[in-house]
């Protein structure tokens, strides 16, 4: 179900950052596969859009949905109230098409894959709505479902040195990731310094990821800045 899918996404997001939790996740969970079959045959998403290929894209409406269904249990409703929805402009920043472009089914499918790869989005659907007046024009309704992005991390090192971290992969609904880590000794609870990391996954719409981090721990002081782009990104 969609609820189970979001649960797996949330657990995977929390465990993917460190080797041991990541290994445990892979041992204990098998992520459900998105059902792409119809009558026993694989459904090509782009083929469903072929009737609209070449038509002019008109209005693009973004409908953002919370992590859990509004009718969920009490804990899920509380989580929805705590969670800040991804902003409209953040979703639009990741779109590979604009109003006035010709609809390309393959491009829309690739765009859905791109947006699903974001830590803060668990799913996306694109609905094509034929224009009531102009048969050469279609409007798009893009529906996104947020992921739960707040997580706690920890690390145990030699000589009683410990790290505790808190991160949000969608700080204030911006799509940016902020992580704060503090270090202390388990022996006498002496302070060992703080580290802060900030990541922007799509800097100014360029699809480059900007990263900056700094601070100190028991071992050293650091200041890092980086700019990278994944090979498969636009």
Question: PLM ranges: what are they?
Answer:
Residues 1-234:
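Immediate N-terminus of the mature polypeptide
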């Amino acid at each position: 179900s969609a609820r189970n899918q979001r649960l797996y996404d949330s657990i995977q997001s929390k465990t993917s950052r460190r080797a041991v939790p990541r290994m445990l996740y892979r041992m204990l969970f098998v992520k459900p596969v998105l059902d792409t079959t119809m009558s026993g045959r694989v459904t090509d998403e782009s083929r469903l859009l072929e009737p609209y290929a070449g038509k002019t894209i008109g209005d693009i409406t973004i409908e953002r949905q919370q992590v859990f269904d509004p009718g969920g249990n009490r804990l899920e409703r509380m989580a929805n109230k705590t969670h800040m929805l991804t902003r409209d402009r953040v979703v639009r920043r990741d779109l590979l098409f604009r109003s006035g472009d010709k609809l390309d089914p393959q491009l829309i499918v690739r765009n859905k894959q791109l947006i699903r790869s974001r830590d803060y989005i668990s799913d996306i659907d694109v609905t094509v709505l034929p224009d009531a007046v102009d048969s050469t024009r279609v409007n798009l309704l893009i529906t996104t479902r947020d992921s739960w992005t707040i997580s706690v991390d920890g690390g145990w090192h030699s000589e009683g040195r410990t790290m505790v971290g808190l991160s949000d992969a969608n700080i204030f609904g911006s799509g940016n990731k902020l992580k704060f880590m503090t270090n202390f000794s388990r022996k006498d609870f002496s302070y060992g310094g703080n580290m802060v990391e900030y990541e922007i996954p799509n800097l100014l719409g360029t699809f480059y990821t900007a990263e900056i981090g700094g601070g100190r721990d028991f071992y050293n002081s650091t200041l890092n800045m980086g700019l990278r782009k994944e090979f498969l990104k636009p």
